[in-house]
Amino acid sequence: MDSSKVPVKLAKVIKVLGRTGSRGGVTQVRVEFMDDTSRSIIRNVKGPVREDDILVLLESEREARRLR
């Protein structure tokens, strides 16, 4: 697959909501799209992440379920 033709969206982490996953290896965050700052969604992120990080989202429509 040619990665130069995959549309990506840039999103900025505005709030870290908490840890999830069986061992806490996934972090749930609220992100705001760089091109449309009025739109924000919740995503699960694997690996280290903190506020003001920029994420490259290959799939921008999928939203994570909130933690209980």
From Swiss-Prot:
PROSITE patterns: RIBOSOMAL_S28E (PS00961). It holds the Pfam family Ribosomal_S28e. Keywords: Cytoplasm, Ribonucleoprotein, Ribosomal protein. GO terms for biological process: cytoplasmic translation; maturation of SSU-rRNA; ribosomal small subunit assembly. Its main location: cytoplasm. It is found in: Cytoplasm. SUPFAM superfamilies: Nucleic acid-binding proteins. GO terms for cellular component: cytosol; cytosolic small ribosomal subunit; nucleolus. One of its GO terms (molecular function) is structural constituent of ribosome. InterPro entries: NA-bd_OB-fold (IPR012340), Ribosomal_eS28 (IPR000289), Ribosomal_eS28_CS (IPR028626). Component of the ribosome, a large ribonucleoprotein complex responsible for the synthesis of proteins in the cell. The small ribosomal subunit (SSU) binds messenger RNAs (mRNAs) and translates the encoded message by selecting cognate aminoacyl-transfer RNA (tRNA) molecules. The large subunit (LSU) contains the ribosomal catalytic site termed the peptidyl transferase center (PTC), which catalyzes the formation of peptide bonds, thereby polymerizing the amino acids delivered by tRNAs into a polypeptide chain. There are 2 genes for eS28 in S.pombe. Component of the small ribosomal subunit (SSU). Mature yeast ribosomes consist of a small (40S) and a large (60S) subunit. The 40S small subunit contains 1 molecule of ribosomal RNA (18S rRNA) and at least 33 different proteins. The large 60S subunit contains 3 rRNA molecules (25S, 5.8S and 5S rRNA) and at least 46 different proteins. Belongs to the eukaryotic ribosomal protein eS28 family. This is Small ribosomal subunit protein eS28B. It comes from Schizosaccharomyces pombe (strain 972 / ATCC 24843) (Fission yeast). The gene is rps2802.
